[in-house]
């Protein structure tokens, strides 16, 4: 029996949106879904129980960071990532490829993998398809991602083509190396913003018959409209019966537009990162609660939100906490932002089920862009 199964429950008539169900060894996920990011085996400032209490059905953890610290062997000895961090629901791990190419001091890229210098202590490491699979098997995630080359944006067509070729070879190597039967491996489609190379990558990666597919190399600085056009381009090249995961995307508008274009899964550090900087998402747009304008504002962050933060605390109090550098301020803004996106995905799922996605999306945009904060 496969480690994961995916069922499309309903398709939207006017868009490419799908309502689905993804079953994993640690539970079932209703899609489309947003996955909070727990880079270091923790969603920053929150306990796993709190994250689950918000309705998060799956989280993401980072292979690169956990490989460097505390090390895959320690997590294996602990019984895997679920036991190590006390999270009983599904976990997806990325391959480490994006961080190797973006964070680490690259030493050498070869067909076998990447030699790099750790951003923590300068030590030299090698990570390739086999190594990435070994680390992710030790972590014991429900879904592992194939090791890929994420080419920076902008890049020349030659650089993007080389990345597509290497990503395809590495995808095959990942399948050869992977052994764990209770863990699925998703392939990753690259190709930058060049439609021809996206189509080529999609053909080559889907030919390997992974149980799911990540769409990588987007949301890296390209205009949003360009990302949307690439998603539209890919719809006809991805299997209808397998989940589609848009990597690193988490703003409300991108979630809605991704769902319309057939995406089932999303992850991003955005909601938690901007929360720690004092920015929150509300029904009527983004609110920078650190600003002096809110020093005497005794309303909740979002009067229409029912999260723990908005039920109990005011903008003035949260601003005070942030200015005083109190940890509670970071926790309260994080709770709110994650609640906001998880509730948004719940509304989108309900809208697909009821055949009202376009209507619900239009209503969201009208209010979110109104500026009535």
UniProtKB/Swiss-Prot annotation:
Keywords: Glycosyltransferase, Metal-binding, Queuosine biosynthesis, Transferase, tRNA processing, Zinc. Gene3D superfamilies: Queuine tRNA-ribosyltransferase-like. Pathway: tRNA modification; tRNA-queuosine biosynthesis. InterPro entries: ArchSynthase1/Queuine_TRR, TGT, TGT-like_sf, tRNA_ribo_trans-like. Zn(2+) binds at residues 305, 307, 310, 336. Its EC number is 2.4.2.29. GO terms for biological process: queuosine biosynthetic process; tRNA wobble guanine modification; tRNA-guanine transglycosylation. Residues 248-254, 272-276 are annotated as: RNA binding. It comes from the Bacteria. Substrate binds at residues 94-98, 148, 190, 217. Belongs to the queuine tRNA-ribosyltransferase family. Homodimer. Within each dimer, one monomer is responsible for RNA recognition and catalysis, while the other monomer binds to the replacement base PreQ1. This is Queuine tRNA-ribosyltransferase. The lineage of its organism: Bacteria, Bacillati, Bacillota, Clostridia, Moorellales.
